[in-house]
Each structure stands twice: as C-alpha cells, then as structure tokens.
Swiss-Prot record:
Localization of this protein: Cytoplasm
Gene3D superfamilies recorded: ACP-like
Modification after translation, per record: 4'-phosphopantetheine is transferred from CoA to a specific serine of apo-DCP.
GO terms for cellular component: cytoplasm
Known pathway: Cell wall biogenesis; lipoteichoic acid biosynthesis
Keywords: Cell wall biogenesis/degradation, Cytoplasm, Phosphopantetheine, Phosphoprotein
InterPro entries assigned to the protein according to its UniProt record, in alphabetical order: ACP-like_sf, DltC, PP-bd_ACP
Protein name: D-alanyl carrier protein
Carrier domain segment(s): 1-77
Cysteine pairings via disulfide bonds: none
Gene name per UniProt: dltC
Family statement drawn from the similarity comment of this UniProt entry: Belongs to the DltC family.
Length: 78
C-alpha cells in the first residue's frame, strides 16, 4: 500500500469517518482532530512508517490537512 493510502487509513480510523474527499480540509478548524487525537496520529505514523515525529516539534500548520500529513510523512521517510 502506498503512503497516501496508509495515511488516509490511519486518519479514517482516528477520526472515525472517511476523509478521502476532504484532502485539503483543515482538521483542527473542522473539529475532526484535537490534541489527544493529534498525539495518537503522530504515534501511529511513527509506528507505521518508522519515522520520528516528536510532539515537541509538531507545527500544526504543517499537519492540518490530509495532504499536508502525507507530504510530511513522505519527507520524513526520505
């Protein structure tokens, strides 16, 4: 499975709905993610992709849409 599909699957699980048609929607403005679910997202991404995404370095503006999460994960994978 490609990074995009795996990230969308993780997001769908955490958010509890299919977000595949909301790829540029802001999670935080829409209320789909809060601080607890953000930590869960980062931990799931670290585990799935063997990357480091420390909460202490989290910049909400870089992770606020599905497309941005995918781009960030791809950049961390190298």
């Amino acid at each position: 499975m490609a990074v995009k599909e795996e990230v969308v699957e993780i997001l769908n699980t955490i958010i509890g709905e299919d977000i595949s048609d909301q790829m540029d929607d802001d999670f935080f403005e829409s209320g789909l993610l809060d601080s607890m679910s953000t930590v869960e997202l980062l931990l799931d991404l670290e585990s799935k992709f063997n990357i480091q995404a420390p909460v202490s370095e989290f910049n909400r503006d870089e992770w606020n849409t599905p497309n941005k999460v995918i781009a960030k994960v791809e950049s961390l994978i190298g």
